Amino acid sequence: MAAAAKTTTKSAKPRRTRRTARRDPLAISLLKKDHREVAAMFDEYEQLEGDAEKLALFNKIALALNVHTQIEEEILYPEERGEVDDDLLDEAYVEHDGAKKLIAEIEAMKPSDQYYDAKVKVLGEYIAHHGKEEEQPGGIFSQAKKGDEDLNEMGERLKARKEQLMAELSAKKPS
């Protein structure tokens, strides 16, 4: 019986798994969290029927994407130049430009306009593809983790800049 109790006690101890042992640094976890939140918003958009609801949610999506791309372009991408393959960073900038153009097109439309929903759907697919490329093995995040940058310290700066931009850009949006 003592052996059984010992086994029970031993198995009750929390085990450290590879996943918990390799937690992402703050910069990467913050950006991945943004990817998940925006993906959830696009999923929610698909369920909406009313124009007012669609417009309100799209405005949230656009704000989140504008802030996310800006913090990546101001902090992550320039500081990872030399740590991450130039081609990956160049492609990321081009993908951001394409997303910004599509966001501007959608912002100039009304939800009742032809192709509005289609453009939002394509933007969601475009963003999902971009996020997948950043997160995949060999992608920007993977290469950044192998570099010399302090990604936890960078994460603090990304977080602070994100908060600042959210406040600034939210204040500019008409309610």
What are the language-model segments listed below?
Residues 2-175:
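Small-residue-biased structural context
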